[in-house]
Amino acid sequence: MNYSEDTPVTTRAPNESLALMLGGGGARGAYQAGVLRAIARRYPTLRLPILTGISAGAVNTTFLAAQAAPLPEATEQLVRLWLSLTPDQVYNVHTLPLLGNVGRWGMRLVGGGHAGKEPTKGLLDTAPLRRFLERALPRDADGALPGIQHNIRTGRLDAVALSATSYTTGQSVTWVQGRDVTLWQRPQRRSELASITVEHVMASSALPMLFPAVRIGTEWYGDGGVRLTAPLSPALHLGATRILTIATRYSRSREEADRPLTDGYPPPAQVLSVLYNAIFLDLIDEDIMRLERMNRMLDDMPPSDREGVGRETGPPF
């Protein structure tokens, strides 16, 4: 498609303030794609002008933001993308490179962090994932994704935002591409204007320790779920009045929650599972509960007292 020939859209749909927020969870991104396809089939004219993503959700967010096709067709393409994905398209599955990385990690620990001539940036080599994303997301010569800018210019998309963790500064950073964007800053969180590229997606989805950090500008970045304590915040700052997010686990009953996950001393896999759930899943649930409490509090306030709340400083997230 020749994007330069498209005419900007001036009319706006009634659901213009609806945002889609997609969190992390690795292969759970495939579940997100399936749910989005079901939603698009049920509501084929649905517009999602604000798209935000973290980790695996950044892959889905960026793919949808770059599509010229209507939502039903775009989600079908997204599902096909996940169905075509195999482990060897995510990381190098050969044993020798993995053993070499593990050995170098061990030497760094024993040596007090000294990297030597060839520092290991991650246990897994994710060059295959970068190639997979470059094939899935058409790029300009400078790496920009023309589909995103086209959708912003024509009014189909207001903004897309991806979040990552800066290992250089310790901050959570949200990259935003959109129109009429007002940036925000909170303690240990900041936003930046950016032209979204595959590198931003790689940075947002770089699992700690497992995947190598990604350098953008002068900073090194890893998975966006590590430091982002308010995952709904980017959507709110970008003007969303409603947020659609997709849970990748069901709400357990009290009996199920109290049931032991393992007998005896917890194995490393169980410890890592709890850790990663805390990073990628728990914060979204907590942020939703916090937003619901704030909405109930505002509903209980007289309309005259609500006027101007958040107008000067933006959402308190």
Where are these regions (language model features)?
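Patatin-like phospholipase
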Residues: M1-I54, T62-F317
